Amino acid sequence: MRSCTVSTMPRMICRNADLEFDWLQPCFYPDEDDFYFSGPNSTPPGEDIWKKFELLPTPPLSPSCAFLELSTEPSDWASEMMLTEADLWGNPDEEDVFGPGGLGSLTPNPVILRDCMWSGFSAREKLERAMSEKMQHGHEPAATGPATQVPGAGAASPAGRGHSGTAGAALPAELAHPAAECVDPAVVFLLPVSKRNPVPVRVAPARAPARASAVGAAVARAAAPATAAVAAPPGLSSRPPNGGDHKVLSTSGEDALSDEVDEEEDEEEEIDVVTVEKSCKTGGTTFTLTVSPKNTALGLGREQSRELILQRSVPIYQQHNYAAPSPYVESEDAPPQKKIKREVSPHPLKSVIHPKGKSFSPRKSDSEDSVRRRNHNILERQRRNDLRSSFTTLRDHVPELVKNEKAAKVVILKKACEYVHYLQAKEHQLLMEKEKLQARQQQLLKIIELAWTF
C-alpha cells in the first residue's frame, strides 16, 4: 500500500483522481500494494507515521476546587480550567454557585467531573507536561499526605481563585479512588440554580446507610466555621465520614425512596380490623375489612390484605317459574296475607298451602306447571279444531261458498252475514203473505157458513 499524506509533506501525486484535490486525504489506499512512495521525502510506515494515530492518554479526574489560595494568578493549566467564567474575566461581583466560592461553601473538597474533552490540539503539550509533573509529584513521599484546606477557601471572593502547591499531590490520590471520589454534576445539580441563592442541602457519609435526602438538592457540608451555614431539614442526621478527606455525595433515587418509605412506616398507625354490620329485613349483612400495617410501596410481598365477607340469612333458590312469588318475600309480611285469605275465603287451606309448597319445593311447582301447560295446550288445540269445523259448516250453508273449499274465514263470515240478511228479508215477506192468506181463509169460511144456512 502506498501512503498519501497531506500538508505536512511536500506535494505528491496521488493516483486516485477522486481524492487528489480533497482537503484531507487518507494516508493509505486499499487498492495499492506498495508500502510507501519511492519519492525523496516519503516516510516509511514506522513509528513516525504511527505517531499521527497516537491517542492521548486518558485525562485525569478534575482537580479539586478546595486547593485555593489567596493568589490572583493561576498556578498551572488545571487551575485555569477549574476557574469559572466570572473568575477568568476578573469580575468579583459575578459569582456563580459552580465557582470556587459556591463549591467551597458546599464542601471542603468537592470533586466534580468538569470536562473530559481535554485532548484538543491547543492543550496537547500542556497535557503531556502536566501529566509528567503530576506523576513525578505522586511518587514523592510528601505528596501522599492528605490535602490541606485553606480556611478562607469557601468564601465567595475573588481572592480565593488560586491553587496551593498540593494540588498536584492530591491528584494521584483521586486517581487511586476514581469511583469513590468523583460524582456526576448531573446527579448533584439536577435543577437550575440561581446565583447568590444558597440551596438547602443535606449531608450524607461516603458509606452510610441509605437514609439520604430527596433527589434534587446539592449535598455538601461547610468547609470552615467562617463559611455560610447551610440549612438542613429537620429529622435528618449528619454522620462523620469513615475515612479520608473527601466525602462522597449520596443522592441515589433508591436511597431517597427507602428513606421516604421508612419515615412513612414510622408515622403510620396500625389498623387492625374494621367491621361494619348493616341489618336489613331480609337478613344481616356483615362486611369485614382487614388492613395490614405494612406499606404497599415496597412490592407485591407487602400488599395490603383485604377480605370481603358477605353473608345472607335467606338461601337463594334457582327460580324457574316466573309466575311464582319470589323467594325473597319478606317473612314479616307473609302472615298478614294468610290472615286476609282466611277471612275472605271459606276454605283457605288450599290457597295457603300451595304458595308455601311452591316456594319451598321448586321441583313440585315445576311439575304442576308442566301439567297445567300441557292441559292448556290440549284445550287450545281442541278449541282451534272446533273453530275450524264451525267455519267449514258455515261455509257449507252459504250457497255461494258451498263449492269453494279454500275460502278464507273473512270471506265466509261476510257471505254468511249477507245470506242471513237475505233470509231475514225472505222470512218477513213470507210472513206477510201468510197473513194475507189467513185473512182470505177467514172470508171464505164465512161465505161457506152463509151458504149452508140458506
Curated annotation (Swiss-Prot):
Pfam families membership: HLH (PF00010), Myc_N (PF01056)
Keywords, comma-separated and alphabetical: DNA-binding, Nucleus, Proto-oncogene
Listed Acidic residues bias regions: 256-269
Disulfide bonds: none
Residue stretches making up the bHLH domain: 371-423
Record-annotated membrane-spanning stretches: none
CDD domains: bHLHzip_N-Myc_like
Biased composition regions of type Low complexity, renumbered to the chain: 151-161
GO cellular component terms listed in the entry, alphabetical order: nucleus
GO function terms (MF aspect): DNA binding; DNA-binding transcription factor activity; protein dimerization activity
Signal peptide (UniProt feature, chain positions): none
Region listing for Leucine-zipper, in residue ranges: 423-444
Cellular location(s): Nucleus
Positions of region (Disordered): 132-166, 230-269, 325-374
Biased composition (Basic and acidic residues): 363-374
Associated pathology: N-MYC2 proto-oncogene protein is overexpressed in liver tumors. N-MYC2 is totally silent in normal liver and is probably a retroposon. WHV virus activates N-MYC2 by integration.
Subunit structure: Efficient DNA binding requires dimerization with another bHLH protein.
Protein name (database record): N-myc 2 proto-oncogene protein
